Amino acid sequence: MSALWRGRDPNSACLARKGPGPRRIDLPKGTPPDCPAVRQSCDTSTMATASVLEREMFSEAEAARLLRVPQSTLHYWLDGGQYRRKTYKPVIRLHPRGDRLVTWAEFVEAGLLREYRRTHRVPMAELRTFIDLLREELGVPYPLAHQQPFVSEGRQLVLEAQDASGLEADYCLVAVTRGQLILTPPAEAFVERVTWEGDIAAGWRPHDDPDSPVRMAPDIRFGLPSVKGISTAVLWEHIDAGEGIEEVAGAFDLAVSDIHWALAYENTLHAAA
């Protein structure tokens, strides 16, 4: 029996969930501080009591749009469902929650599943078992939103979980090469997208291009994609309305290259819509 089976109760690691905060409006530099949009309030006590990973950030539809996966697929990963008269438990959540809100940790873990979904059908049962094993061993509800499984000392745990769950090679996160544990290409691509703070995923690069400065972070623009704190959607709207790139860059105190990156990212979203 794998060393991962230690009888831990995964429910003990689960934290209370809190509701998402209001969305912030991006304004050009020079906007008066008493502008109503600047005075939007946020329940900071709620933000403080919920961990970053457990914070509800997006509607299910918005998360699916940002991940560029069908909403039905994301819902299947989050809450499970039925396929050919067989009921499947969730892959990401411990239990179905029945709502349409997505936490930051759930979004990040769905980003990992997306890396595998590009070329394969995600095996629900095996991945569920695999994540359950990591959840039990690490004592956290969302183990793949933590850095530990991906660094050298945590890869042995991942290897054991892969073996114990019967996960096929196409879906493995680590592989043994010349006696060393290395990340598989999908896992490595995922890790490169994440900004780690300590052990947790504190940021995410939604753009496929590794050079892109577009980032998502739960404490910046309420998790929406941004460049240097300015929403890419807002920048795209200004350009779409006919404003010049240099004009928009100057208004938001950004480099022209930042605007180009924001447009490139937004164009991928609009193309996938």
Q: Would you name each region that the model predicts?
A:
Residues 92-93:
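An extracellular/luminal cadherin ectodomain-centered signature
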Residues 31-34, 38-76, 82-87, 97-101, ...:
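Long, charge-rich, low-complexity intrinsically disordered regions
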Residues 7, 19-21, 30:
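Residue-identity detector for glycine
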